[in-house]
Amino acid sequence: MAKKKNKAGDNTIALNKRARHDYFIEEEIEAGLSLQGWEVKSMRAGKANISDSYVIFNNGEAFLFGATIQPLSVASTHVVCDPTRTRKLLLNERELASLFGKANRDGYTLVALSLYWKNAWAKLKIGLAKGKKQHDKREDIKDREWKVQKDRIMKNAHRG
């Protein structure tokens, strides 16, 4: 039997929807993750959460902090599973230097946007982010509501 190809939407493991609400995303970067076996199994089962995760730098390396990958109940018992451990990001030297310089500017941080599969590899989309003020969030909500209202008006106008 032929193997089915994954559709474009099937490869997403976890999304950080709050990131686009709380931050202006200026740049997006794709990074690999250094994972343990039980983490890959749990991610295949969809037990990952990156809602409050961000990137920290330590000794010239980048790490994902705050991501939670819940272990499966059928996972091996001889391995100690820490769901909230910091995971190393796999970036080349040039990408690390660029991100480190950009993230050290005032008001900027690196947040996790999405976790997904690319072929057989788990990838993390990182966003260079600047925090939004409350009035910026209100403007986004107004724009979104106006777009919905405009679409509704156009739909009714076409029915005519």
From Swiss-Prot:
Biological processes annotated in GO: trans-translation
Keyword RNA-binding in record: yes
InterPro entries the UniProt entry points to: SmpB (IPR023620), SsrA-bd_prot (IPR000037), SsrA-bd_prot_CS (IPR020081)
Major location (coarse): cytoplasm
Record keywords, A-Z: Cytoplasm, RNA-binding
PROSITE patterns: SSRP
Location of the protein in the cell: Cytoplasm
Domain of life: Bacteria
GO cellular component terms, semicolon-separated: cytosol
GO molecular function: RNA binding
SUPFAM superfamilies membership: Small protein B (SmpB) (SSF74982)
Function field: Required for rescue of stalled ribosomes mediated by trans-translation. Binds to transfer-messenger RNA (tmRNA), required for stable association of tmRNA with ribosomes. tmRNA and SmpB together mimic tRNA shape, replacing the anticodon stem-loop with SmpB. tmRNA is encoded by the ssrA gene; the 2 termini fold to resemble tRNA(Ala) and it encodes a 'tag peptide', a short internal open reading frame. During trans-translation Ala-aminoacylated tmRNA acts like a tRNA, entering the A-site of stalled ribosomes, displacing the stalled mRNA.
Family: Belongs to the SmpB family.
Name of the protein described by the UniProt record: SsrA-binding protein
Species annotation: Actinobacillus succinogenes (strain ATCC 55618 / DSM 22257 / CCUG 43843 / 130Z)
